[in-house]
């Protein structure tokens, strides 16, 4: 899953050495994401934050950070991190999906998720998991609309409360609740 295409999007590996300016714009365009991750509404990400994100998201062979670009113009509008498999677990995780707020609500996030799920299915994965910060109820609602179900709660590395969600990638298999 190094390159995925949809009718409106191209998802491709992020070059860990490329300047992070476009991703900085994407991150800072999302006040809900800022508040959920920073714990305060007005705290913005800076270039070192985004460089650290890219370094972390590309540092292991099983981590894939994909840029989400508009197919028509090539403009960067988001990113997604796929960890397949997640350390010590027999299934992949989506570590982050973020779209520039100007492009939200147009079905592009769902289109990106569908492409990622199809890519994971082609690689032989049968389910995918993710974690949503409890401070981000909009994100949980988005994932539930994509067919993900909550199966638990935990704290992340920073001690923030999270919902655990999963989805079967096998057609006709019931979702676990």
Model-derived features: where do they sit?
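Conserved G/P- and acidic residue-centered "switch" motifs that form tight phosphate/ATP-binding loops
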Residues: 107
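Conserved GNAT acetyl-CoA-binding A-motif
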Residues: 122-131
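Conserved acetyl-CoA-binding loop of GNAT-fold acetyltransferases
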Residues: 144-153
